[in-house]
Amino acid sequence: MIKMKLHIKLAEFRMTQKELSEKTGIRQPTISAYCNDSNKHIVKEHLDIFCELFNCNVEDLIEYNKKDGQ
């Protein structure tokens, strides 16, 4: 299972979803979906924007855990 960790970066930077939306041009509902892990897909360009803004690696934004029994 792939999980987004964007909400952790927002907390580290003391930034709101609205502020992130304003800084990146990414719609706030999209950012909310990333933070709530409810997006069905992740836009590669968004990852690039987040990594540049937060000066981090993709691994800091996404986590992969195998499902039980695999």
State where each predicted segment sits:
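Recognition helix of helix-turn-helix/homeodomain-like DNA-binding domains
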Residues: 26-41
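The alpha-helix within a helix-turn-helix
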Residues: 10, 21, 51
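DNA major-groove recognition helix of helix-turn-helix
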Residues: 10, 35, 42, 46, ...
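A short, Lys/Arg-rich alpha-helix, primarily the initiator
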Residues: 1-16
